[in-house]
């Protein structure tokens, strides 16, 4: 039996690493609510939301089509994950709006904390499900995948800056 190259085997592990990095960033976002000035929160929120959006777009446009072709039995799961991405996107849009409109008082901070906690819970549920359902399939992709498809999957499993 020919073993797949280590680079491809790492895709499932890399997905988990991406999710760990995004979990840390949402935690930092919550911590930023304690800062005396919300300007840092606004900048961090924009950066965090952009990172999640880039990751999900890379999955939807790259990794998921490759997985669907290589593992057709995963199509229903991939469709469900893509629908989750829309829900997450809507939640991130709501958070971004709230951060942009928020005053610097306790009521605003409380509303922001509720929204950040909501986004964190949504992402945790999504990430856990995604890891359970597709990480092994990502790691099972073989060296026959081809450079273009491997690059698409690599983009979706790249840890955000």
PLM-predicted stretches and their roles:
Residues 1-161:
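Small-residue-biased structural context
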């Amino acid at each position: 039996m020919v073993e797949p190259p280590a680079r491809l085997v790492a895709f499932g592990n890399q997905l988990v690493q991406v999710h760990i990095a995004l979990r840390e960033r949402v935690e930092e976002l919550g911590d930023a609510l304690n800062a005396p000035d919300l300007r840092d929160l606004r900048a961090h929120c924009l950066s965090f939301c952009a990172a999640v959006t880039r990751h999900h777009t890379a999955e939807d446009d790259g990794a998921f089509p490759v997985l669907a072709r290589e593992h057709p039995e995963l199509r229903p799961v991939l469709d469900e994950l893509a629908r989750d991405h829309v829900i997450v996107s809507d939640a991130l849009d709501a958070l971004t709006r709230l951060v942009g409109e928020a005053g610097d008082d306790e009521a605003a901070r409380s509303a922001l904390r509720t929204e950040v906690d909501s986004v964190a819970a949504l992402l945790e549920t999504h990430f856990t499900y995604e890891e359970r359902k597709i990480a092994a399939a990502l790691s099972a992709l073989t060296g026959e995948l081809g450079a273009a498809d491997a690059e698409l999957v690599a983009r979706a499993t790249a840890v955000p800056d």
